[in-house]
């Protein structure tokens, strides 16, 4: 299989429109890497430069130690799956999957062997004689993936392959891609704007914004220790609550004081603040909705709030609450933790008291947005 290395890669359109800037990344053999970010961040452009579909303005792309900047896409030994299936409507599934092999004049026996093997892995053997119009969206996407698989390429590139599918089918195909990766054991580079896809599929995630890499890490690393506010708010759903408050040091202990409450920082976060000798200062505090809990009114750590919106998600409630100064927060509560009477109370206008779990809070510089502990 193959390693992929990008060194100081830059892409400029026209004279001064910078799409990708200073992109440096080493991708290990058989790694599943995901580029994720909002529209226009440069993720698809980067993938297309790896594929050879976009020229590189500066820097180098290497596949298996060979610089491929000047190689045509067909000479890079890569396979690519696009957002659009791009199947030939007049050809059967078998013929679509075999098309590139026949162009290369691969022997017919080998064509049959490769296509049927890929079809079996993807669960589309029974559709090999059908034409694309007789297939569902998910089945067509499997055919597109199979067409790439039969090429037996070193690197598998996937550009938002699930974005045309409905939510249910997207979830199903996401699971199938995870299983596919385990079966074919090759290097994957996958592009998506969906952080759920990124978190569930990737060995590592590359989070991009405005052409720059913001953070590279495992799903756990980027979720637990986002390097800045952009990553913190982009990764995780519902998104992280962020607001200005003060971090207060009292001896070897740290507290945050949002909305008049006093909440102690505990666990590893407290140890890290102490090790860095962080002093009292104004910060932007980040708290994920699942780390907001209900509190007793008399507790010094309690923050009074009023429910404005209750989103019933089935296994959990997403409460949009407003504290007394007008700031809005999201609270995520598993429904299994609530009694029937408590559920009935969670309606517009209901007052409740919340607090934050002290061991999982995040602290950002209010001017730069950088995580104080990253």
What are these regions (language model features)?
Residues 23-34:
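Pre-Walker A (P-loop) beta-loop-beta motif of ABC nucleotide-binding domains
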Residues 36-38:
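The feature captures the beta-strand-to-loop junction immediately N-terminal to the Walker
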Residues 51:
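Helix-to-loop junction immediately C-terminal to a conserved catalytic motif
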Residues 57-60, 110, 210, 361:
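Conserved coupling/switch loops of ABC nucleotide-binding domains, chiefly the family-specific signature
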Residues 59-67:
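Conserved ABC transporter NBD signature motif
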Residues 73-234:
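ABC ATPase nucleotide-binding domains
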Residues 249-374:
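Non-catalytic connector elements of ABC transporters
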